[in-house]
Amino acid sequence: MKKIVLLIVILIFLTGCSSLAIFNLSDFTIPDDELFIMTIDNLKTPEEICRYMADNFEYEEHPDITLSPYQLYLIKKGDCNDYMTFSIFIADYHEYETYYVLITFANERYKHSITVYKENKYSFSDYEMYFLPKYDTFLEIVEYDCFLRREKWTEYIVYDYDNGLIEKGSNN
């Protein structure tokens, strides 16, 4: 039995299955930390959220876990999935309609995640930058993000704040 479990774990790793776990924000409770609460109160727009992340966080891969918004706030190191969870939580707190997009690149073992905000049009952010609201579709955002990264995508999946599936796209 142990050999079977080990074999399954190895197969998942070798097939490039990312462990970009979807953090269930409905289970997240804002901690009783005045500085954290003040921080989220002051980050009122997606652009402010992204600027805060760029100024305060350092990119570090966490392929096996997704940090809560508070954990990222405390340790200040995370990957695109951690940044995405942080930004979605704070934007939703300020009543923005938010989505997250998981993108599978053709030549990558791991998926990439970005945050999408519904302003007049769609805007988005990754772990580095905020992109102005000028996009009409999720596909446009995926195409542009991949263009910037010089990557080809094979699949993308869009979820809403409550982890509901919104859209899937394939580029095979």
Each language-model region and where it sits:
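Sec-dependent N-terminal signal peptides
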Residues: I4-L14
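A structural boundary/capping signal
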Residues: S18-N172
